[in-house]
Amino acid sequence: MSLKWTDVLEIAIQLDESKPEVDPRYVNFVDLRRWVVELPEFSDDPQRSGEKVLEAIQAAWIEERD
């Protein structure tokens, strides 16, 4: 499975599994973007991320953690 920026929930799940020590409420977007791009299954253009998609990923990650 290859991940795109639109796969918000799956990205959040993978971040939650790979970064259990991180509290997603306090993640800055620079780190979040880097971690998404570094996911093994991520295959989208790294330059296509924007604030809205990063906010959606962060919100989904917070929800996943709860």
From Swiss-Prot:
Disulfide bonds, paired cysteine numbers: none
Pfam hit, one: Fe-S_assembly
Signal peptide: none
Biological process, per Gene Ontology: iron-sulfur cluster assembly
GO CC annotations, alphabetized: cytosol
One GO molecular-function entry: ferrous iron binding
Protein family: To E.coli YfhJ.
Protein name: Uncharacterized protein PA3808
